[in-house]
Swiss-Prot record:
Subunit structure: Heterotrimer of A, B and C subunits.
EC number: 6.3.5.7
The protein's name: Glutamyl-tRNA(Gln) amidotransferase subunit A
Matches recorded under InterPro entries: Amidase, Amidase_CS, Amidase_dom, AS_sf, GatA
Function: Allows the formation of correctly charged Gln-tRNA(Gln) through the transamidation of misacylated Glu-tRNA(Gln) in organisms which lack glutaminyl-tRNA synthetase. The reaction takes place in the presence of glutamine and ATP through an activated gamma-phospho-Glu-tRNA(Gln).
Catalysed conversion reaction: L-glutamyl-tRNA(Gln) + L-glutamine + ATP + H2O = L-glutaminyl-tRNA(Gln) + L-glutamate + ADP + phosphate + H(+)
Keyword Disulfide bond: no
GO molecular-function term, one example from the UniProt record: ATP binding
Gene3D superfamilies hit by this protein: Amidase signature (AS) domain (3.90.1300.10)
NCBIfam families, per the entry: gatA
Amino acid sequence: MSLFDYTIKELEEKLHNKEITVEDLVKESYQRIHEVDQEVHAFLTLDEEKALEKARELDQLEDKTGILFGMPGGIKDNIVTKGLRTTCASQFLDNFNDPLYDATVVQKLQKENMVAVGKLNMDEFAMGSSNENSGYEPTRNPWNTEHVPGGSSGGSAAAVAAGEVLFTLGSDTGGSIRQPAAFCGVVGMKPTYGRVSRFGLVAFASSLDQIGPVTRTVEDNARVLEVIAGHDQMDTTSANVEVPSYTEALKQDVKGLKIAVPKEYLAEGVSKEVKDAILEALKVYESMGATWEEVSLPHSKYALATYYLLSSSEASANLARFDGVRYGVRSENADNMIDMFKKSRSEGFGEEVKRRIMLGTFALSSGYYDAYYKKAQKVRTLIKNDFDKILEEYDVIVGPTTPTPAFKVGEKTSDPLTMYANDILTIPVNLAGVPGISIPCGFSTEGLPIGLQIIGNYFDESTVYRTAYAYEQATEHHKKRPQLGGAK
């Protein structure tokens, strides 16, 4: 049995009782990475020497305090880490080896004495749904390496599923934590927009991006969010709202809980296996005293188009800073300064990033702004209003995280629109700004995980966690492990 089959709380007790050391945990993490990551490709950069040095320092401390004391974790490679290479999985930043500061979430993790083992693979600049847009080797799904892990936080989900680390951080702009969590059979939370500081997150779409945790269990997830959540003066979009004890919320049952199930989330396009898994999950909730009713989110059918217009427009502006002057790739074939800007960006960015920059620039251009960008903002408000109305009457919204289980590597790369449709059930949550979590709720006939998505009201992650935990404890799905490289 791997040490990483225990929860963070259980490992904390083992450390306290001196059954294990922090060095044991960190060594196990790297041993597992060296054993299986040549198949999974979850990590882009490792920090083994410094991590082991920190582990030994922590073992020497008499006061072993910290909510995540000694726990090995991984950081998505678009979250800045001081002195540790940060590439956003882009060749443009391949030589960005020494960032000058830590993101706020990294500072908070360090304050609780976690150990960062390395930086995780992703779709380039977080633009993608399969991790096939990585500027390096694409991450593979630990349950079947012929399948994708999801994206853009594919490395974050795959590393946890493969037992390489106890927890990871990802970012979620349109489903980039929840979708890979569903594909990899782990727990992934996108908090309320503003709940977690974005300072130090390389921006994709600033009005949609949110950092969140990926773990094997709901309890571990709640524990990590308690650490990283909270107001930050360095982020003007950070909400000054009190952070409750999410782990305390897990102790409450779901008797009397009112669940809304949008008919649009079980409509055509959602596979029968996924529908059946969701309906079975609803039966579990009924057995625990919760009730559910079918509802409608009528504007969700416009969410995909709205999202890609808005997110690409914001990306067009945010990625303008990557010009080859201060850091990153600089073309050696330029005739002048303007030519250098153009060629550096053309040579440094991958195809999907360039596609979205062009789409966003078009939507913001003179003559098209009102027809596209402004109209998309109005539709976003309608989508938000749909959620507000439902969440006034119900405690949570429940449905599938993805329309299907993980698809095969290369299956959808030739058709961007088909690829984009994978996020159709997660995107509305980002547009509304509400919290959402994905937890395992079954497996396909091919043995691939299926995810249950639970959506809550603004800053009410506690109810989302309570709902997720009740289901998790009533089922066994989260206890299954992929058979990878002689897996645990």
